[in-house]
Amino acid sequence: MAEGGGCRERPDAETQKSELGPLMRTTLQRGAQWYLIDSRWFKQWKKYVGFDSWDMYNVGEHNLFPGPIDNSGLFSDPESQTLKEHLIDELDYVLVPTEAWNKLLNWYGCVEGQQPIVRKVVEHGLFVKHCKVEVYLLELKLCENSDPTNVLSCHFSKADTIATIEKEMRKLFNIPAERETRLWNKYMSNTYEQLSKLDNTVQDAGLYQGQVLVIEPQNEDGTWPRQTLQSKSSTAPSRNFTTSPKSSASPYSSVSASLIANGDSTSTCGMHSSGVSRGGSGFSASYNCQEPPSSHIQPGLCGLGNLGNTCFMNSALQCLSNTAPLTDYFLKDEYEAEINRDNPLGMKGEIAEAYAELIKQMWSGRDAHVAPRMFKTQVGRFAPQFSGYQQQDSQELLAFLLDGLHEDLNRVKKKPYLELKDANGRPDAVVAKEAWENHRLRNDSVIVDTFHGLFKSTLVCPECAKVSVTFDPFCYLTLPLPLKKDRVMEVFLVPADPHCRPTQYRVTVPLMGAVSDLCEALSRLSGIAAENMVVADVYNHRFHKIFQMDEGLNHIMPRDDIFVYEVCSTSVDGSECVTLPVYFRERKSRPSSTSSASALYGQPLLLSVPKHKLTLESLYQAVCDRISRYVKQPLPDEFGSSPLEPGACNGSRNSCEGEDEEEMEHQEEGKEQLSETEGSGEDEPGNDPSETTQKKIKGQPCPKRLFTFSLVNSYGTADINSLAADGKLLKLNSRSTLAMDWDSETRRLYYDEQESEAYEKHVSMLQPQKKKKTTVALRDCIELFTTMETLGEHDPWYCPNCKKHQQATKKFDLWSLPKILVVHLKRFSYNRYWRDKLDTVVEFPIRGLNMSEFVCNLSARPYVYDLIAVSNHYGAMGVGHYTAYAKNKLNGKWYYFDDSNVSLASEDQIVTKAAYVLFYQRRDDEFYKTPSLSSSGSSDGGTRPSSSQQGFGDDEACSMDTN
């Protein structure tokens, strides 16, 4: 069917719902095609057909009709139709299978010029296969060996094969079919890896975002242009690291050539990669060097290349790399004797081997930076959520990695079955010892030795006072931050006075407040009564949503464009008014077609009109008055003697985006609503209803109009009917939506685009935003974590005495703490409507974190910790950048790790609002013997000697707000 078109016979709402319902439950199958639809359009369709049982209000009403499928909100560039970055499933788009898409397309059509967004289902995981739709394709940089400066970008699915890429490159670079070619993966400066296994997929090959691929055509004499380089490099010293002596050769070979900047000499470094043979993966596990042998780098100061949104992984890895007990364990090869390849919960030792390989490279002292390609590939095989190239969470990666390393290195070969016992009034020390011993019977690894501690959890039934005490192991502490209570919003106020421009305001409202709170705050600044305000989300020149006063502000996203309109419920004479949404539309004739297309433009209006004066003439005059600031009226003789006809479109069944006879059924039912006594609605297709009206009202002069009106759906994309100019009252209500239809020439002559978009800034916008110095101490977060709370009604506890679920009180306490204490600051919060990041500065001590007072075990050892690493997150939730601060275990100095860049840091840089995950090392740990304990502090990043162990920290934690 034609693009943009919909079928003439659309099923009723119930049929649409029954046909699409089962299709939306389709299981993902590898290789299947699914389509993206803007969630705003899809939600409108669901309302229209009553798809959700809890939202059956006004099902099938014409004003809810969604019109053609419109995905414009998903594009960062409407021309190229490139997807915006960081789109979120269900929030920004929905995924529908092919059959569902075809039905929707047949019923509604698609906005003219838009191409369907179709994506493949790919499979992830090694043991547990997991299918997901690959929303974001991988961008690869392609070039020919003879001209590396001519780089072309192309997108591929992870399911595409190397052969597919080679075929595409041969076509792009016009390489004759009879000429042999080889494909090379260029990475890390001037290192090349041949991709010789053509049936491998992009995912199998470990290709990443922005990877450069080079195609090499064979010379006419049968030799290869790169052959000379390869033969030369074969004599260079090898620096290959393999994961196992038993590893088989990889299908990839690599060769590198580097120019040494300091001096005239040149050096080549030839490397033959080895792959991990187990599992038949065939992955290359080597990390090619780029530094000359003569250059010495401080071990551990090795950057990690960003493989495409992998800064989250790099940040977590740098923190773990600078955790001395764990790193020494791998550098001394102690892991080799403890790999558990038979653990069903493990990963056959492959995660441990990949991590060991990377750590050895990072601490070799030879590399300024490496690309952790194969480590990421291995992680993606076992944890599909990390297999793509979208931004992830460093703490989530850290949690997976610690758990994966634990299971791969678990010394327990056969886990015994253990029955959990209740405390039953026994002393805490007895129950805690029993819980820890049981934990160690099933879990015994370097991760448990280093990172595991013990919680005490106490539940009390509010009815029978039953006390339940349990002790549970933990690997890291997730500490809540005190929630901010307010939210700053920027909105536009559109006054009722047509001569006043809209004004932008900045208001502070309760974080969990209602729309009425926004109106009250705006009223205090503007002087306009809150009851005369209507709050709307404007999107693509239309109202996406008009809010009720009692709706929560958490329905409003930070990215939404919020306009607040001043309206009147009664007119000056006290009569009742109706408030109507009115859109601007421009009619555009299609080439070689008698039909016309329309496009919304400008800011929509909310117009209050007295009900007893609601005729077409008064409506036209009210709109003209309302837009008089940026629309000039034509002079009486400006159009000569003929009436102004802005396109034969108003009410035409050819009127909207290919919607031929789009709303026939709605036109029929809508006619009863437009006027008390309306003439025949049987307008001939293609005729302007204004002409029809003129024929009806003989003897009346034809008015000169800038635009005509159409009754449309809430999207403004489908016409329902024309408005009668018979002088009778129009039967319109607040759920009716109108469109002003302009022709292109009239818009050009009379519509002032610049003035229509002009607005003023209130003083609240001009003044520097006063940000509260939201600073809390780490102590506050720990106290909040250990505070007693009452369980919510949706998260009750089953009381064994009462035999029912109860909203018990719950309290966490710390019983024992590990050698390495990992503290996760819970900065991200989200619900169905709201996603936010807390930028609170948490002051944490660099040295002397005394946790003893928070440990409820009175006989416990002292717990005093010093900071060794911090994972930072800059930016908002779902976007931004991760870095790390870490203290080198050899020289005791602090360094800043930003992907491949490593720089010296000082202590006063570390405590910022970006701090996300903290790593602390216990002072009595045998590994903790660094120069920092004896060296004096200096500006070069050295640390000062600790002064005491009194209080929460030896020294006052510094804070720096990076606003």
From Swiss-Prot:
GO terms for biological process: negative regulation of protein ubiquitination; positive regulation of TORC1 signaling; protein deubiquitination; protein localization to cell surface; proteolysis; regulation of protein stability; spliceosomal tri-snRNP complex assembly. Disulfide bonds: none annotated. Phosphorylated at Ser-445 by PKB/AKT1 in response to EGF stimulus, promoting its ability deubiquitinate RHEB. The completion of the deubiquitinase reaction is mediated by the DUSP and ubiquitin-like 1 domains which promotes the release of ubiquitin from the catalytic site enabling subsequent reactions to occur. Residues 485-775 are annotated as: Interacts with DUSP and ubiquitin-like 1 domains and is required for USP4 activation. It comes from the Eukaryota. Residues 1-17 have a biased composition (Basic and acidic residues). Residues 229-295 are annotated as: Required for USP4 activation by providing conformational flexibility between the DUSP and catalytic domains. One of its GO terms (molecular function) is metal ion binding. Residues 657-666, 953-963 have a biased composition (Acidic residues). Residues 405-407 are annotated as: Necessary for interaction with RBL2. Residues 459-463 are annotated as: Necessary for interaction with RB1 and RBL2. Residues 142-226, 483-571 form the Ubiquitin-like domain. The DUSP and ubiquitin-like 1 domains promote ubiquitin release and thus enhance USB4 catalytic activity. However, these domains do not bind ubiquitin. Deubiquitinating enzyme that removes conjugated ubiquitin from target proteins. Deubiquitinates PDPK1. Deubiquitinates TRIM21. Deubiquitinates receptor ADORA2A which increases the amount of functional receptor at the cell surface. Deubiquitinates HAS2. Deubiquitinates RHEB in response to EGF signaling, promoting mTORC1 signaling. May regulate mRNA splicing through deubiquitination of the U4 spliceosomal protein PRPF3. This may prevent its recognition by the U5 component PRPF8 thereby destabilizing interactions within the U4/U6.U5 snRNP. PANTHER family: UBIQUITIN CARBOXYL-TERMINAL HYDROLASE (PTHR21646), UBIQUITIN CARBOXYL-TERMINAL HYDROLASE 4 (PTHR21646:SF45). This is Ubiquitin carboxyl-terminal hydrolase 4.
